Amino acid sequence: ISVHRCLGVLRPLHSLRWGRARYARRVAFAVWVLVLYCQAPVLYFVTTSTRSSRIICHDTSARELFSHFVAYSSVMLSLLFAAPFAVILVCYVLMARRLLKPAYGTSGGLPRAKRKSVRTIAIVLTVFVLCFL
C-alpha cells in the first residue's frame, strides 16, 4: 500500500500501470503466503500442559528449544517488522519531501491539504510502530 501511494505521489502516470486490481491481488496473495510460511514454525515451538483436565497453551517454547526460538524470533522480527517498516519509512519520507517542496511559481507557506497529508504520514508511521513492535 505504501509503495503504491508513494508511486502515486512521486510518479502519478507511472503508478496507473501498477495500480490495477489484478496486480494488487497478486501482491497481496504473495504477501499472505510469505507470512503464513514464516509463521508456520511457531506451531513447532508451542508447548502445552494439562492442569485439572484443562489444556493450557504456553507462550514460550520448551527449554531445549528456547535458543532456537530466540533465533527464529530474531529473524522474524527482521523479516516481518524491520523490512516492511524500512520500506514504509522510505516511501513516506519521499512522499513528505515531495509534499513539502513548494510548487513552481508559488510563494508563501504550504497549502492546508499538503500540511494535512504530511501530518497523516507522521500518524501512519507512529501507528505502525505502536501496533507492530
Curated annotation (Swiss-Prot):
Chief location category: membrane
Transmembrane segments: 27-47, 75-95, 117-133
Parts of the chain on the Extracellular side: 48-74
Pfam families per UniProt: 7tm_1
Membrane topology qualifier: Multi-pass membrane protein
Cytoplasmic side: 1-26, 96-116
Keywords on record: Cell membrane, G-protein coupled receptor, Membrane, Receptor, Transducer, Transmembrane, Transmembrane helix
Gene3D superfamilies: Rhodopsin 7-helix transmembrane proteins
GO terms of molecular function: A1 adenosine receptor binding; G protein-coupled purinergic nucleotide receptor activity; G protein-coupled UTP receptor activity
Function: Receptor for ATP and UTP coupled to G-proteins that activate a phosphatidylinositol-calcium second messenger system.
Similarity section: Belongs to the G-protein coupled receptor 1 family.
Name the record gives this protein: P2Y purinoceptor 2
Gene: P2RY2
